[in-house]
């Protein structure tokens, strides 16, 4: 997969190219990340990339020419079929469904804004889609771009050590992940649930699904509103709710 980055701070992306899952993907040739800085496409000695906005107001805007030329260079390197994305608070909010959708593209170009944003004409002429990682303000598009890269890379075959990992991640099926445990079996009186030690894979799958449903109901109930639960899922969720109510009643009685 090819990902081009247009950013005033391309060195920030070493966090992606040099470390962890994405770093291994780059090293193994599964992920090709290249970057272009608009400063390299300026024509004045100060390498100016920003200017005051027409109409006044605080802050500066990224200028058209250096940014557009950097995008064109990234497009030329990517070849035909590259989708150009601008990381923007005005964009579609990134979720697991969106990540899965973006992962179907073999070529992405991510444009990172700075200052108060970019000239609207760049968006009109060069950008295919705008994406946001949340309703809050950041200093630039680099961190959102890194978030997008990390999440999309998990869908590239061979990137994860276990192919089931991406499937079993939180949100992969619209639910939060279930609890996980490793050694020791007992920690300060807290024991691993016996079913996980049973070796009964059918019961383990059932327990994990019940916990995933229950955790979603407790922490992100709005996610369940968009799901059409199967008969098994509905039954397991009902069981979880009953067990949770019993635990709460027991806890209240001990208080």
Curated annotation (Swiss-Prot):
<dbReference type="InterPro" id="IPR016009">
    <property type="entry name" value="tRNA_MeTrfase_TRMD/TRM10"/>
</dbReference>
<dbReference type="GO" id="GO:0005829">
    <property type="term" value="C:cytosol"/>
</dbReference>
<comment type="function">
    <text>Specifically methylates guanosine-37 in various tRNAs.</text>
</comment>
<protein>
    <recommendedName>
        <fullName>tRNA (guanine-N(1)-)-methyltransferase</fullName>
        <ecNumber>2.1.1.228</ecNumber>
    </recommendedName>
</protein>
<dbReference type="InterPro" id="IPR023148">
    <property type="entry name" value="tRNA_m1G_MeTrfase_C_sf"/>
</dbReference>
<comment type="similarity">
    <text>Belongs to the RNA methyltransferase TrmD family.</text>
</comment>
<keyword id="KW-0819">tRNA processing</keyword>
<comment type="subunit">
    <text>Homodimer.</text>
</comment>
<keyword id="KW-0949">S-adenosyl-L-methionine</keyword>
<dbReference type="InterPro" id="IPR029028">
    <property type="entry name" value="Alpha/beta_knot_MTases"/>
</dbReference>
<keyword id="KW-0963">Cytoplasm</keyword>
<dbReference type="Pfam" id="PF01746">
    <property type="entry name" value="tRNA_m1G_MT"/>
</dbReference>
<dbReference type="GO" id="GO:0052906">
    <property type="term" value="F:tRNA (guanine(37)-N1)-methyltransferase activity"/>
</dbReference>
<feature type="binding site">
    <location>
        <begin position="133"/>
        <end position="138"/>
    </location>
    <ligand>
        <name>S-adenosyl-L-methionine</name>
    </ligand>
</feature>
<dbReference type="InterPro" id="IPR029026">
    <property type="entry name" value="tRNA_m1G_MTases_N"/>
</dbReference>
<dbReference type="InterPro" id="IPR002649">
    <property type="entry name" value="tRNA_m1G_MeTrfase_TrmD"/>
</dbReference>
<keyword id="KW-0489">Methyltransferase</keyword>
<feature type="binding site">
    <location>
        <position position="113"/>
    </location>
    <ligand>
        <name>S-adenosyl-L-methionine</name>
    </ligand>
</feature>
<keyword id="KW-0808">Transferase</keyword>
<dbReference type="GO" id="GO:0002939">
    <property type="term" value="P:tRNA N1-guanine methylation"/>
</dbReference>
């Amino acid at each position: 997969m090819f990902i081009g980055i247009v950013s005033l701070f391309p060195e920030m992306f070493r966090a992606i190219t040099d470390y962890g899952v994405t770093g291994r993907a780059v090293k193994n040739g599964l992920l090709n990340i290249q970057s272009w800085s608009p400063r390299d496409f300026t024509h004045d000695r100060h390498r100016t990339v920003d200017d005051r906005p027409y109409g006044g107001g605080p802050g500066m805007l990224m200028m058209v020419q250096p940014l557009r030329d950097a995008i064109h260079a990234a497009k030329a390197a990517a070849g035909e079929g590259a989708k150009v994305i601008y990381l923007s608070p005005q964009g579609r909010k990134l979720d697991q469904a969106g990540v899965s959708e973006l992962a179907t593209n073999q070529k992405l170009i991510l444009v990172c804004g700075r200052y108060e944003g970019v000239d609207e004409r760049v968006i009109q002429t060069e950008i295919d889609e705008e994406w946001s990682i949340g309703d809050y303000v950041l200093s630039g598009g680099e961190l959102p771009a890194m978030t997008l890269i990390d999440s999309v890379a998990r869908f590239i075959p061979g990137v994860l050590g276990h192919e089931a990992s991406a499937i079993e991640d939180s949100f992969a099926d619209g639910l939060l992940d279930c609890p996980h445990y490793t050694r020791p079996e007992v920690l300060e009186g807290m024991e691993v649930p016996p079913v996980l030690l049973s070796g009964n894979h059918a019961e383990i799958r059932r327990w994990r699904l019940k916990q995933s449903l229950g955790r979603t109901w407790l922490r992100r109930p709005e996610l369940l509103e968009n799901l059409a639960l199967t008969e098994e899922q509905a039954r397991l969720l009902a069981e979880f709710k009953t067990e949770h109510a019993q635990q709460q009643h027991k806890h209240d009685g001990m208080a």
